């Protein structure tokens, strides 16, 4: 039976760092002395939890286990109040160099495997067909082109190959060409429709014909009309003659050639490449729908507003950083960045399956 000794009669251990045996069981981990321990107090270089795994009933001591290295905070003595904390060294969290090699920054090649290219599947197909010698490719050749030029698509091939098949069959700008008798093989060829200008929009190919709202915006940007009427009523002889005199070539559409040439400029490191027409037109030459912010009638003008609003606020000259009046101009450089810029992004609405 343990006898109780009053505190006044018990021996005092003043500065030797010697505690009672019962206190030493818990003081190493959870008790911080008020004074700096003397050199006589010996501390283990590292706590080996393997010694306590089979002798104690504490369910938390087996967490690190004998096979794992101790935490860096346990390799030193108890942290005392007011003393600076020690930081993890250059060797890393594991203690030895190379223990956390997976935490190193990825290389450029590894980064390309992680980041998805900012092109839709239809744009990838167009680039593959345009790079072919005869401007036509089979389905397997399109797969091979995408996998060779974009490392991101080397994994999970079943998903993106299915999306490419859907884009080939649903987009009107891709045409299926049967094989000749002199060219035996499996699968048909795919080529680009020469009249795919209506399907081309900001580096992507729409699945079907443009909506009416998009056609109106295109008329305001390009400054001509009558294109939609020619599509809706092809029986009109005047419209058909106008379509016959259109500058669209039988080889490739001008907008498509512009886009694919700019893809080559981006690959060669050119920074002066602009977006396809009508986006290549300077913003100062485009008509901005400023009537939206006026009265209810777009033709009505209010003199008191014209005198109050400065001329520089309604100008459509872009800033140096790429920001312009995107609220007044739907084709501003903020919504459609330059292809040579690092933040190349395209809107993906309706551009892929």
From Swiss-Prot:
Q: Where is the composition biased (Basic and acidic residues)?
A: 213-222
Which Gene Ontology MF annotations are present? DNA-binding transcription factor activity, RNA polymerase II-specific; RNA polymerase II cis-regulatory region sequence-specific DNA binding
Assigned GO CC terms: nucleus
Q: Where is the composition biased (Polar residues)?
A: 226-252
Q: What is this protein called?
A: Forkhead box protein I3-A
The protein's organism comes out as Danio rerio
- Domain of life per record: Eukaryota
Q: Which SUPFAM superfamilies match?
A: Winged helix' DNA-binding domain
Compartments, record wording: Nucleus
SMART domains reported in the protein's UniProt record: FH
Q: Which PANTHER family match?
A: FORKHEAD BOX I2-RELATED, FORKHEAD BOX PROTEIN
Chief localization class? nucleus
Protein role:
Transcription factor required for epithelial cell differentiation. Involved in specification of skin ionocytes from epidermal precursors.
BP terms from Gene Ontology? anatomical structure morphogenesis; cell differentiation; epidermal cell differentiation; epidermal cell fate specification; ionocyte differentiation; multicellular organismal-level water homeostasis; regulation of transcription by RNA polymerase II
């Amino acid at each position: 039976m343990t006898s109780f000794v009053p505190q006044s009669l018990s021996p005092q251990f003043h500065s030797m760092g010697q505690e009672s045996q019962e206190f030493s069981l818990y003081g190493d981990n959870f008790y911080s002395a008020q004074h700096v321990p003397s050199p006589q107090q010996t501390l283990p270089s590292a706590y080996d939890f393997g010694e306590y795994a089979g002798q104690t009933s504490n369910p938390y001591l087996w967490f690190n286990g004998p096979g794992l290295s101790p935490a860096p905070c346990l390799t030193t003595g108890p942290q005392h109040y007011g003393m600076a904390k020690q930081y993890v060294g250059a060797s890393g969290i594991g203690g030895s160099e190379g223990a956390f090699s997976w935490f190193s920054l990825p290389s450029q090649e590894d980064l390309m495997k992680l980041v998805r290219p900012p092109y839709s599947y239809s744009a990838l197909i167009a680039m593959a067909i345009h790079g072919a010698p005869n401007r036509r490719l089979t389905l397997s050749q399109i797969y091979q082109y995408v996998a060779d030029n974009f490392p991101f698509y080397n994994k999970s091939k079943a998903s993106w190959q299915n999306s490419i098949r859907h884009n080939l069959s649903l987009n009107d700008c891709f045409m299926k060409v049967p094989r000749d008798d002199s060219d035996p093989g499996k699968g048909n060829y795919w080529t680009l429709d020469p009249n795919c200008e209506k399907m081309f929009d900001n580096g992507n190919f729409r699945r079907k014909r443009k909506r009416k709202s998009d056609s109106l915006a295109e008329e305001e940007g390009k400054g001509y009309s009558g294109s939609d009427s020619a599509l809706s009523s092809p029986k009109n002889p005047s419209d058909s003659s106008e379509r016959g005199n259109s500058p669209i070539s039988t080889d490739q559409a001008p907008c498509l050639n512009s886009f694919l040439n700019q893809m080559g400029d981006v690959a060669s490191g050119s920074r002066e490449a602009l977006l396809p027409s009508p986006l290549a037109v300077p913003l100062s030459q485009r008509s901005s729908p400023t009537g939206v912010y006026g009265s209810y009638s777009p033709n009505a003008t209010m003199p008191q507003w014209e005198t109050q609003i400065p001329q520089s606020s309604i100008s459509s000259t872009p800033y140096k950083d790429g920001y312009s009046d995107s609220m007044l101009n739907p084709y501003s450089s903020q919504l459609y960045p330059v292809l040579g810029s690092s933040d190349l992004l395209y809107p993906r609405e309706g551009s892929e399956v």
